[in-house]
């Protein structure tokens, strides 16, 4: 019998899943939902929020890294249009990550201080996936690998990305193969070092912007990369402000100076020439 304010189950809905792959099995929900283990004693109500916030961030970072590596592979094979698809997806994930800070911002200083001491030296600064994304976007910093010496898998991943070309490196190399004038010094540079502003690249991008109709996919890629960097900065800023409203000017659990350290990250750039060209157009 169907009562009011209810929806009857359709006859073809699968009811017996004993021999079928179920939703929970496919997503490994038994493991996923058993991965939240508060360390506070007695267990603090808000620690679950804190854990889930960071775990979901790590899941999204995993997807971003997956998409950026694929985009880089496409660029290396001169497949610009498929790479644009990956970059577009990354941008949407970035929007989700930035907005997600509003959930953690519901944690007040008075609530957080009640379990912060149980976190020891663990810190979001130690997120190897976040560092991996910075590396693949060109923010190379070999010193950062020291933080992951205890984790063989993470250290190997980051060391590999440190020595590999960034997404930006591969994009500029693609432009070179298409006949655009790229400085030899850029093509031959040590990709394990951070990319710094190269004024000789600006005329290249100016030419693309001023002949957009003839270079539409390259023009679109330039704008996608600017969007990506801008979104990254939005995320960094929301991170900074969430930390500031939660712990003020206290030092981070990982030993950093906290807010002032995060503020300096706002000065880091991935694609400085794509911003500089705007002054020249």
Swiss-Prot record:
EC annotation? 1.13.11.11
Q: Where is heme annotated to bind?
A: 239
Q: In which pathway does it act?
A: Amino-acid degradation; L-tryptophan degradation via kynurenine pathway; L-kynurenine from L-tryptophan: step 1/2
Listed under GO biological process in this entry are: L-tryptophan catabolic process to acetyl-CoA; L-tryptophan catabolic process to kynurenine
Name the top EC class.
oxidoreductase
Give the required cofactors. Answer: heme
A GO MF term? tryptophan 2,3-dioxygenase activity
Q: Mind listing the UniProt keywords for this protein, alphabetically?
A: Dioxygenase, Heme, Iron, Metal-binding, Oxidoreductase, Tryptophan catabolism
What the entry lists under Gene3D superfamilies is as follows: 1.20.58.480
Q: Where is the signal peptide?
A: none
Q: How is the cofactor bound?
A: Binds 1 heme group per subunit.
Which residues take part in binding substrate?
50-54, 112, 116, 253
Q: Which reaction does it catalyse?
A: L-tryptophan + O2 = N-formyl-L-kynurenine
What InterPro entries does the record tag this protein with? Trp/Indoleamine_2_3_dOase-like (IPR037217), Trp_2_3_dOase (IPR004981)
**Role noted for this protein:** Heme-dependent dioxygenase that catalyzes the oxidative cleavage of the L-tryptophan (L-Trp) pyrrole ring and converts L-tryptophan to N-formyl-L-kynurenine. Catalyzes the oxidative cleavage of the indole moiety.
- Oligomeric state and partners? Homotetramer.
Name the protein family: Belongs to the tryptophan 2,3-dioxygenase family.
The name this protein goes by in its record: Tryptophan 2,3-dioxygenase
């Amino acid at each position: 019998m169907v009562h009011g304010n209810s929806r009857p189950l359709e006859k073809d809905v699968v009811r017996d899943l004993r021999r079928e792959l179920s939703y929970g099995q496919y997503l490994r929900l038994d493991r996923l939902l058993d991965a939240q283990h508060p360390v506070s004693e007695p267990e603090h109500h808000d620690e679950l929020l804190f854990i889930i916030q960071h775990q979901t961030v790590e899941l999204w970072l995993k997807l971003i890294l997956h998409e950026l590596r694929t985009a880089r592979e496409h660029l290396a094979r001169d497949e610009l249009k498929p790479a644009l698809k990956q970059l577009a997806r990354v941008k949407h994930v970035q929007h989700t990550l930035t907005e997600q800070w509003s959930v953690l911002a519901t944690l007040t200083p008075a609530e957080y201080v009640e379990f912060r001491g149980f976190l020891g030296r663990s810190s979001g600064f130690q997120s190897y996936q976040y560092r991996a994304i910075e590396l693949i976007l060109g923010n190379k910093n070999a010193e950062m690998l020291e933080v992951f010496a205890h984790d063989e898998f993470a250290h190997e991943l980051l060391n590999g990305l440190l020595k590999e070309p960034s997404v930006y490196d591969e994009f500029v190399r693609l432009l070179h193969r298409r006949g655009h004038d790229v400085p030899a010094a850029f093509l031959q540079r040590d990709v394990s070092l951070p990319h710094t502003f190269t004024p000789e690249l600006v005329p290249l991008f100016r030419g693309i912007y001023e002949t957009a109709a003839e270079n539409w996919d390259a023009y679109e890629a330039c704008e996608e990369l600017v969007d990506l960097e801008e979104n990254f900065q939005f995320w960094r800023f929301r991170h900074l402000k969430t930390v500031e409203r939660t712990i003020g000017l206290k030092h981070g659990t990982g030993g950093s100076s906290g807010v002032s350290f995060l503020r300096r990250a706002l000065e880091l750039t991935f694609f400085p020439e794509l911003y500089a060209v705007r002054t020249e157009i």
